[in-house]
Amino acid sequence: MKIISVNAGSSSLKFKLFDMPKEELIFSGLIEKIGDQKSIFSLSYGNTKKETIMPVLNHQQAVKLLLDSLQINKIIDNLEEIKGVGHRIVQGGELFKDSVVLTEENILKIESLNDLAPLHNYANVLGIKAFEKNIPNIFQVGVFDTTFHQTIKQENFSYAIPYEWYQKYKIRKYGFHGISYKYVSNRTSEILANKDSKIIVCHAGNGVSLCAIEGNNSVDTSMGFTPLEGVPMGTRSGNIDPTIIEFISYKENKSIKEIMNILNKKSGFLGVSGVSNDARDIEISLQNGNKRSLLAHDVQIKRICDYIGSYYFLLKGIDALVFTAGMGENSSLFRKKIIQRLSFLGVFLDDEFNNSKGERIISTSNSFFKVLVIPTNEEIEIVREVCKIKN
């Protein structure tokens, strides 16, 4: 059974085609700069990789290009072979506790949450409607980044603000990276052979968050009402004193919108280092003696350890600490600096395993809890959800 996973952005469409239930990746690609005369269409299947520059004016045209390419490259004979499409949707609010079939009613509910994620949800719906137009009556499922965190208790998701703000506007912690956390949590349970395991997962890419998980349920997470809350990231500030916004507005004569743009897109690694938002560039720079790059790195490491300590206390001890996503999977320095700060908990790295690749345990056998690296796979988790609902 062939299922497509889709991640639609405002000017991009990322997709992967899987043969299920074998979970075999058949075809993948990315369409960038949608709405431009020089859109970039990249695709990959088998040993073949292609890139084409061409005008792609909207998401409907992007989906048609994807579907046509599947037939042109003889990946499928006809569109009837595609049995379902799973869409990553960023914000499900309190309306969605699990993945859902994308009926007209559910699409309207997703659109009603646009205030909570104006850029993301709008783009996600463009992707949904584009598939509807190209393959009428195709079975589509929405898989939300927020639903994994719907198990968080009210004392953990509430802000100490006027309660009417929550009642009127649903201002609360929602958390993100939930699709990744679900995949990694399930995989960790398999490795530990313990469905009730208590783990802390550090999802560290350009966006960074942590999650305390018990029995495959989210207990708390570092991102909040938006992905800006939590630890410093590639371009996001993470937690700051809110009065800084008013202070900078007065000092630099900037609007709130301008300052929020700086906190989202010009802070984090980029803001502190002045070098880059990319962790790889930061590591090269700090190893070459750049003090601001070292500061940017150390500030992030310190804040991550703050959350690990908090969640360790919340869970009353853990079975494992898990690293995933870009930095989490690929940076041995990142992991080493964190574990060094946690050594008082009785956890130590095996340097050989820390410096190797792939899914593995990287802690020593005498460590008080295990440290794992598990490459995330959000696309697989999305198509699994499609199959679960379809069946």
From Swiss-Prot:
One of its GO terms (cellular component) is cytoplasm. The keyword Magnesium applies. Substrate binds at R88. The active site is at D145 (proton donor/acceptor). Belongs to the acetokinase family. Homodimer. Its EC number is 2.7.2.1. Its cofactor is Mg(2+); Mn(2+). The gene is ackA. It comes from Phytoplasma mali (strain AT). Catalyzes the formation of acetyl phosphate from acetate and ATP. Can also catalyze the reverse reaction. It is found in: Cytoplasm. Pfam families: Acetate_kinase. InterPro entries: Ac/propionate_kinase, Aliphatic_acid_kin_short-chain, Aliphatic_acid_kinase_CS, ATPase_NBD. ATP binds at K14, H203, A204, G205, N206, G207, D278, A279, R280, G326, M327, G328, E329, N330. It catalyses: acetate + ATP = acetyl phosphate + ADP. Pathway: Metabolic intermediate biosynthesis; acetyl-CoA biosynthesis; acetyl-CoA from acetate: step 1/2. GO terms for molecular function: acetate kinase activity; ATP binding; magnesium ion binding. This is Acetate kinase. The record marks H177, R236 as: Transition state stabilizer. Keywords: ATP-binding, Cytoplasm, Kinase, Magnesium, Metal-binding, Nucleotide-binding, Transferase. GO terms for biological process: acetate metabolic process; acetyl-CoA biosynthetic process. Mg(2+) binds at N7, E378. Mg(2+). Can also accept Mn(2+).
